[in-house]
Amino acid sequence: MKKNYYALAYYHFTRVDNPQEEIALHKELFKKLDVSCRIYISEQGINGQFSGYQPDAEYYMNWLKQRPGFSNVKFKIHHIEENIFPRATVKYRKELVALGCDVDLSNQGKHISPKEWHEKLEENRCLVLDVRNNYEWKIGHFENAVLPDIQTFREFPEYAEQLSKEHDPETTPVMMYCTGGIRCELYSSLLLEKGFKEVYQLDGGVIAYGQAMGTGKWRGKLFVFDDRLAVPIDEADTDVSPIAQCSHCEASCDTYYNCANTDCNNLFICCEECIHSTKGCCSQECSQAPRIRSFSTSRGNKPFRRMHLCEISEEQEKPLSCCLR
């Protein structure tokens, strides 16, 4: 009998006096459950990506909401067929979003619902910022959105400063979005510090928009940091036209692979024909390398376990080399 699984995305900023205790409690609980995850906990709160057998996932959601400080955590749920992380990983991270500077979380952009977001996109009077990575943007983004020209998220404060010089903060309304919402919590605050008077952030991120509005103003797929790599934002509409291109032949494609060359492991976009001809590698040079992992289409585009993508945070310090392709 086929089992039903949930994929959960969630975060919550709250004071955590003893992060190591929370980590230990999570690890002990997960020993008893059919789950996998990548969860970061710090004095700032929690940021989690999680998958689990449906009853176990529901148990965890109820359990976490009973923990001190986490009663208001909001979970975004996708229905999946299996666990999507290689293991249950729960770690300490000083910054839930790697930014390298202090941010006043009491001063944030206005959270607007997916419906309000959609209406503002139709009005087309705001500067729309996509505050994700380049490789996320490549396969999907909102119409008319701008991708900041930065290589790491630590460069965003400098970008915000430059933005305030290129656009009048007094008269330029700004809308920003990310996958689940956590990055906007910090970046909207930075824009307000730079004098922008009207800053909006998509409540719940692209995930919430897809669940509430369907595909709407979104184009392409949503990059996710797990074995799936890319998903339609609307679970009911999986027939999505690619907006990206194969890195080898430039055919329309949005399938990510990580290179079969162990010493490379680059994340790259590739079509079905080219992935065969290159033995699962990102270049001809890599296809002739001495340490090539066995590639088979039977495994789909599931990442190789070494340097697994789900162990690379969406707020990572260094961009994947695929960003330069």
Swiss-Prot record:
One of its GO terms (biological process) is tRNA modification. Signal peptide: none annotated. Residues 122-218 form the Rhodanese domain. InterPro entries: Rhodanese-like_dom, Rhodanese-like_dom_sf, Rhodanese_C, TrhO, TRHO_N. It is an enzyme of class 1 (oxidoreductase). The lineage of its organism: Bacteria, Pseudomonadati, Chlamydiota, Chlamydiia, Chlamydiales. Catalyzes oxygen-dependent 5-hydroxyuridine (ho5U) modification at position 34 in tRNAs. GO terms for molecular function: oxidoreductase activity, acting on paired donors, with incorporation or reduction of molecular oxygen. Its EC number is 1.14.-.-. It catalyses: uridine(34) in tRNA + AH2 + O2 = 5-hydroxyuridine(34) in tRNA + A + H2O. This is tRNA uridine(34) hydroxylase. Belongs to the TrhO family. It comes from Chlamydia felis (strain Fe/C-56) (Chlamydophila felis). Keywords: Oxidoreductase, tRNA processing. Pfam families: Rhodanese, Rhodanese_C, UPF0176_N. It comes from the Bacteria. HAMAP family: TrhO. The active site is at 178 (cysteine persulfide intermediate).
